[in-house]
Amino acid sequence: MAMRPARRKSATPPKRPKVVHQFLVALNRTDPLVWRRLQVPETYSFWDLHVAIQDSMGWLDCHLHEFRLLDADEKRLVSIGIPTDDGPEDHPVVAGWDVPLSRHFARPAWHALPTLYAYDFGDDWEHVLVHEGMESAEASLTYPQCLAGAGRCPPEDCGGVQGYADLRRIIADPKHPEHASMMDWAGGPFDPDAFDLSGVVFDDPRKRWKHAFDRK
């Protein structure tokens, strides 16, 4: 699947934001619920938000992603993510690095509408993204920030919602014939409730973009 990123303009190091967007991100159809509350700079693009979601949730950013939301002006659904050569012509995906968050989330009348963030179209992970508003940034903090959360992110490529449920069930049963092999695949004991807020580390979205697309 060929990706077609537009050439991104070189950027100067970002200034400390004066205002931040606050989002609640929750992974659909998982038990226990996996969620994070984030604050990101008002200057962020959808690509930048994607990187913050990946890093806070614990995903490895090794699959395609897509934001699906209602366009406030045109009153239609739009898809924002990584354009590909085989995408639908009647519903193209807009490059996330070209769309600032302010394009869709700066209006009070629309901030409460949920957005869908899809990741890994094979496992089909769907996250509900709720814009909770905008806050004044604290001068002593570096953004993005993860304010709170719960639940451990499922392992990559575990088979989606059903595969994750099977993994938890087998790991929880030492007598299951696949217990040892599943433990080995998961890399050892897996606690679905585990979440260490202090362990969240955010990557630079500009470096992530360069690593993914600009390999010269």
What do the PLM-derived regions correspond to, one by one?
Residues 1-216:
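Short linear regulatory motifs enriched in tryptophan with gly/pro/ser
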